[in-house]
Each structure stands twice: as C-alpha cells, then as structure tokens.
Swiss-Prot record:
Upregulation: Down-regulated by phagocytic stimuli.
Gene3D superfamilies found in the cross-reference section: nmb1532 protein domain like
Lineage of the species this protein comes from: Eukaryota, Amoebozoa, Evosea, Eumycetozoa, Dictyostelia
Domain of life per record: Eukaryota
Protein name: Uncharacterized protein DDB_G0283871
C-alpha cells in the first residue's frame, strides 16, 4: 500500500498580524480530519481574543457599568481558555499520545510550557481585574487610576492573545499531520465524541458555542461544517435561546460603535 503523503499546513496572517494555520481545507466534507471540534475551539478562542483587543483599543467608558462589562468580558475569555487548555491536556493529548507516542515529546516540551506561561501572565490579568472590581472609585474614563489600569489591561491582553495564537499554531502543526497520516477515522470520532460530551458539561459551554457561531458569520467553511454537524432545529430554535443570556452580551460589548 502506498504511504500517505505528509500533510503540510500553510501559514497565513490573522487580521491582528499573528501567524496562524490555514485550516479551511480540513473542514471540507472530503477531509480525512474528523476532529472538527478541535478546529472549532481554536477558531472561536482566537475570535474572542481578537474582538476584545479591538474593543479595548478605543474603549472610553462613560459609566461604571461599562467598566463592569469589560471585566465580565475579560473574565469570560479567560475562563474559556482555562477550560480549553485543561481539556486539551487532560483529555485530548492523553488520548492522542496513546494512539501515537511520537506526539508526547513535542506536546509536553513545546506546547505545555506555552500553556504554563499563559497561566502565569493570566494571573497578572486576574490580579488587575480583581483590583478594578474592588476599586469602585474608578467610575469612568476620567477617574483617577483609569488610564494606568486600562493601559496595563491592554498590554497584558495583547501578550495573552499572542500566546494563544502561538500555542494553537504549534499544537496544530504537531497534531494534525500525525492524525491525518496515522490515526483512523474511528479513533478520531471517539475522541471527538468524548470531547463534545465533556464540553457540554463545562461551565463555559454556551459562551464557547456562541463564539463558534459568531465566527460562522464570516467563515463560510466553518459555517458549512457546523451546519452538517448540528441539526437545523437545534441551531435555529435551541441555540438562540441559550445564547441570548450566555454570549450575546459579549457580542454587544465588543461591537465597535
């Protein structure tokens, strides 16, 4: 039997100037990559970070409630990545390494330290958010301490965004070629089902789902992939009700007005 040609990912630039992999070909119906949730999660995470960065570049709150919305948005994105990284390490990686031991060394020596570094920098963000939450004297853009606080928030957020893009970029280049060449569809589906069930029970599930559907608005390949995977009735009836409370607020906050 002729050996499979090693799949090579193409590097493109995000709107924010970060390196990312061109993944659209893997979402096609004839693709041998069946762990679609892996791609969905990465696209959604990059999307919310990008949106939040764009919003904060020109964010000038006129009230304390707007500052509270910012804090809520940062916290939601933080929790998204915390849960995502945990599921990757504790479920996805362990399963994949069982299938192909060659994945162990690069995942644990390249991507794992990136996760650790993100956590360390994110702890700085948590401390800053905690300080902003407790300091009710900061009521709007003219309050003492606001300029310094938002400057630090934007600085840390940019670092975290770069780390997420880099870890996803490296992880995809480690995992995807091996999956395509060595892991059969049945095993990929098994992991996909396990990850889907785990994600459904995660506290961030509805926010993540909202982010995925948000990306679908501008990503035709993802939109078609999601439509094939999720029944029409669920997408059109159940999802809107769930997202109204759990994601739409974020979309409204990051909208540039």
């Amino acid at each position: 039997m002729e050996a499979k040609t090693q799949f090579e990912l193409i590097t493109i630039k995000s709107e924010d100037g970060f390196d990312e992999n061109e993944l659209s070909v893997l979402l096609k119906s004839d693709s041998d990559f069946h762990m679609n949730g892996f791609i969905w999660g990465h696209l959604a995470a990059k999307h919310v970070y990008s949106k939040l960065n764009s919003k904060l570049k020109s964010f000038e709150p006129k009230s304390r409630s707007e500052i509270n919305e910012m804090i809520k948005a940062i916290t939601a994105v933080t929790e998204f990545i915390e849960v995502h990284y945990y599921h990757e390490e504790e479920i996805a990686w362990k399963f994949l390494i069982e299938q192909q031991q060659c994945l162990s060394e690069p995942l644990l020596t390249i991507v794992k330290p990136q996760h650790t570094q993100w956590t360390e920098i994110n702890n700085e963000m948590k401390d800053l958010v905690k300080s902003l939450t407790e300091n009710q004297e900061i009521k709007d853009k003219s309050s003492n301490g606001w300029t310094e606080s938002i400057s630090k928030v934007k600085e840390i957020l940019q670092k975290l965004t770069a780390m997420v893009y880099k870890s996803f970029y490296d992880e995809e280049r480690i995992i995807i070629p091996v999956v395509l060449s060595s892991i059969p569809k049945s095993k990929q589906n098994k992991l996909g089902e396990k990850m889907n069930e785990t994600m459904k029970n995660a506290p961030t599930s509805k926010f993540v789902l909202g982010a995925i559907l948000d990306v679908c608005k501008t990503n035709k390949d993802l939109d078609e992939n999601v439509k094939k995977a999720i029944p029409w009735a669920v997408r059109k009836v159940i999802f809107p009700l769930a997202l109204e409370k759990n994601y739409n607020w974020f979309s409204e906050f990051v909208e540039i007005k």
